[in-house]
């Protein structure tokens, strides 16, 4: 699915959406998601869309539902956010209550729950310890209590953390286990796609693991190289900082060829990179010393 969002300042969003939707459908077969908070832009996009549009989004706010649900005449599926006038609830049960209210309101407009995909709103776990658990619990409740499809912005969970892809992949698997229907993620991420293929193979969604095997056909099964054994000897920076002369000499020698000299009975080791720099400094000093001094 290709997300289409034209919400830029000082831009006529309805006009731009009307221009862009036909142009995109002329160059790609991907389904389009009409992503806008402007009901007029949403209607223009849905009216011109060739097929069944996916719109993002409606929420539990009364104003939002009253603006979006009348557009059912164009057909389509809506992403439904589990938030309302009070914001994003802190508990899974409260998010379920919003989802239930959206389903009931949609039904009054003739919209079946099958045309709603609920986003239980994953936020950064670095800022809120329950940011992962709550949307997952809400997702499971919506699947079991309402029987509705679900979606998550998976990468939101890792914002502010190092090695985000690892966190994203783990969260993605946790969500899939709870019945996630669709995810906003990077399809070019090998870690994410490998996790998805492995899950499908293990969960009986990949007959005879054929898709997994085909995807891994070019991968090597050789184990990764072992990490070098830890050495008791400190590395060069540590030895210098700690004032360990002999260890510093040994560490410098272990790093490869070095320029060596003897001065005052002490061995001086110069790494090739430093030797190159010293060469240029020496040349510069020669030039400076050759210049006539000011009177």
Predicted regions and their residues:
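Short, exposed beta-strand "edge-strand" segments with a Pro/Gly-rich flavor and a Y/T-containing core
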Residues: 106-110, 278, 290
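Active-site pocket-lining segment
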Residues: 119-123
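Short hydrophobic transmembrane-like helices used for membrane targeting/insertion
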Residues: 262, 268-270, 281, 287
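Short linear/disordered segments characteristic of secreted peptide precursors
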Residues: 269, 275-277, 288, 294
């Amino acid at each position: 699915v290709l997300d289409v969002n034209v919400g830029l300042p000082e831009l006529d969003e309805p006009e731009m959406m009307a221009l862009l939707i036909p142009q995109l459908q002329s160059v790609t077969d991907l389904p389009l998601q009409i992503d806008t908070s402007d009901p007029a832009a949403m209607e223009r996009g849905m009216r011109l869309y060739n097929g069944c549009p996916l719109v993002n989004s409606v929420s539990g706010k009364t104003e939002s539902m009253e603006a979006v649900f009348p557009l059912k005449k164009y057909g389509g599926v809506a992403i439904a956010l589990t938030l309302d006038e009070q914001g994003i609830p802190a508990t899974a049960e409260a998010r379920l209550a919003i989802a239930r209210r959206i389903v009931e309101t949609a039904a009054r407009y003739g919209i079946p729950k099958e045309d709603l995909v609920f986003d239980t709103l994953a936020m950064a776990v670095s800022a809120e310890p329950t940011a992962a658990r709550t949307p997952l619990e809400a997702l499971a409740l919506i699947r079991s209590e309402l029987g509705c499809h679900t979606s998550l912005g998976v990468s939101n969970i890792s914002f502010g953390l190092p090695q985000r892809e690892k966190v994203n992949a783990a969260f993605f698997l946790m969500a899939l286990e709870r019945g996630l229907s669709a995810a906003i993620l990077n399809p070019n991420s090998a870690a994410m796609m490998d996790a998805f293929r492995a899950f499908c193979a293990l969960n009986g969604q990949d007959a005879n693991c054929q898709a997994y095997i085909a995807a891994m056909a070019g991968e090597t099964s050789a184990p990764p190289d072992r990490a070098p054994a830890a050495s008791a000897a400190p590395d060069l920076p540590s030895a210098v900082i700690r004032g360990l002369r002999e260890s510093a000499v040994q560490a410098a020698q272990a790093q490869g060829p070095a320029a060596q000299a003897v001065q005052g009975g002490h061995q001086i080791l110069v790494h090739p990179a430093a030797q190159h720099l010293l060469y240029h400094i020496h040349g510069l000093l020669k030039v400076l010393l050759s210049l006539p001094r000011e009177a």
